[in-house]
Amino acid sequence: MKFDRVTGKCVDLSFEGKGVVKLSYGTVFVDGLFPGEEAEIEIQYKRAGSYFGKVFRLITKSKDRIQPKCGVCTACGGCQLQQLSYPAQLEYKTKKVADAFRRHKIENIRVLPCISAEKPYEYRNKIQVPIGRDPHGHIVSGFYRSGTHKIIPIDKCWIEDPRAGKIILELKNLMKQFHYAPYDEDTRSGLVRHVLIRTSAHYDEVMVTLVTNKDEFKGKNNFVKEWIKRCPNIKSLIQNINTRDTNVILGERERTLFGPSFIKDSILGVDFLISSKSFFQVNPEQVEKLYRKAIDFADLNEDENIFDAYCGIGTISLCTSKYVKKVTGVEIVKEAIVDARKNANINNITNAEFLLGDAGEVFEKLVSDGEKYSTVFVDPPRKGLDQKFIDTLLRLEPNKVVYVSCDPETLARDIKLLSEKYEIKAIQPVDMFPMTFHVETVACLRLKE
């Protein structure tokens, strides 16, 4: 069956933004094929009873197909929807969230239209790029071809902050000047493995993390001085040392080569210190819309205490603090709690406390000690809420739960479990990741009367 060619019509887009083609012997998922389009498809492989293929020849085009800005988006795989018009992307994401709830047998709900981005390009404040050589031996940067470790050379990524491109260009120039070789996975030789760049939307600050295969390297001080001279908006330069034979990008050890070990950015007027490994939402424009919607859904008042599970570096906690009497944030990652406390201090916020531990255990202990929380915010990782925390919510019955999710499937799964005692008041997708199949969602639940 592999490399066979078949003709079929796309009837839908999958959860991962692939075209869905129904044939007599099964379903074929096709990259870059959109609803209503007919194509000759080359089958690539079969997995778990489904076929996966690519467009060999497009027979009919959708009215929503557009010319992409990026010439390699079909090979890179990072922008699965860049050939789809932006209004059609928003419709897909709204439907994607609604479909997730239907799959979990949650009926009679209305998913609000996905909130659009004013800047669907050049929005990402974080980018990580491998450094390597092309077949001619030239130093290149870019992204791995989908499903491989072969670098597609890219000088401009259309969804990254444009400040990153200049910094990467100068890195490659300086590598030639200082005779620094890119890392070679086969021989495990060479110096530079990756470069990670974080940019601040509200301050002209950039953090660069250079991932190297060696601890020390010749000419390091002069290399750093020259890079900063050419790119003066670099406010923090970190060396991450990764000498392991691994696909994991970052090593355990880091040192600061220039500036502080953080940069500063802002959400809804609250400043945050961001270190190299901090989790911080990648779209600064859209995260403000997301948090405003979450705060609106919560309908907070100045007399209530709220609980923020999975609080990270305190973004939701600190953005909500001015609306309530007290906010308690809990996170299981020690470094994040340290950062959250620093962020409260630099903003002179005194009604936010941050506790290290399991969210369910801490919540239960605080309530047993007499604390009362009318609203709980949750913003878990992609895997969703822990069952233990869901059980705690059902047992302790806070009046409102505001759920921020990066995965509609786990959101719908968790809300199905919570529907034993909670009813859905609102579901709002937000397009945090234009040009990709990903979508962020905020849902508001209230305790049933």
Can you annotate each of these PLM segments?
Residues 197, 203-213, 271-275:
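Short, aliphatic-rich beta-strand segments
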